[in-house]
Amino acid sequence: IEIPECEIDFKDINIDSHPEEHPGEPKKFQLEWDKFKLWDLKMKNTELVERAYSMASYPAEGKEIMLNVRIATPPWDRNANSWMNVNPGVASSYIFSKKPGDKVTISGPFGEFFINESEAEMLYVGGGAGMAPMRSHLYHLFRTLKTGRKVSFWYGGRSKRELFYTEHFKALEKDFPNFKFYIALSEPMEEDNWTVKDGLDGKGDGFVGFVHQTVIDNYLNYHESPEDIEVYFCGPPLMNQAIEKMADDFGVPPENVRFDDFGG
């Protein structure tokens, strides 16, 4: 996406939540923006720049392009209890400032994060904003191709407040018996009321721990032929490194390991 020369005042940003994603909670993010004084921030961009984002939309959605963007704030000055005098993220500030009907310039898609055409089992792992290409792949696999391949998606976050699209994937799981969706929280909060699943088919919300270790402990250690699985992943750099090592440890050949390294 292109970011032209511009100045963005965060006071002008509309943070009302999406009615389809957060029904009945239009001011869901207001408290957090108030608490951290995001309204005081200003972004100034002095030259035309481009930033790359993973696409969350899939081909059947046509010209509708969906991006998952996390606002990039300056470092926090603990002594002053305020943001440091550093420019906020140029691209995220620009995107957050856009309103329905505004025009932007986008090119692509680029990259090599493609679905391998085979009948092999597919294991997806996503973390944080790495949800974007997961949605694109999985919606294309099931909503368009109606695939019969065995597929699982393991999604990791610190707490429930970091999760999104979960209801969409739970619906996908109900529609397709060959798809399983699991969540792992590394630091569940008290208000999450997180109940730990007793095994893959047990009751509960999900697992506790880092998502790569959750996959190992609950699935790959019991799999008859993990080396035959295709592994797809996208997330923060440390998660990506852990998944790459996991795949190698279980004998998955490099050509069957694919990732979208948005954090690199």
Residue ranges and their predicted role:
Residues 1-99, 158, 184-188:
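Ferredoxin-reductase
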Residues 94, 107-119:
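A short, basic/flexible loop-to-alpha-helix module at the beginning of a structural domain
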Residues 114, 133, 242-246:
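Phosphate- and divalent-cation-binding pockets in alpha/beta enzyme and binding domains
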Residues 119-120, 143-151:
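Conserved S-adenosyl-L-methionine
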Residues 131-145:
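Histidine-anchored nucleotide/phosphate-binding helix
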Residues 150-264:
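Reductase modules of NAD(P)H-dependent flavoproteins
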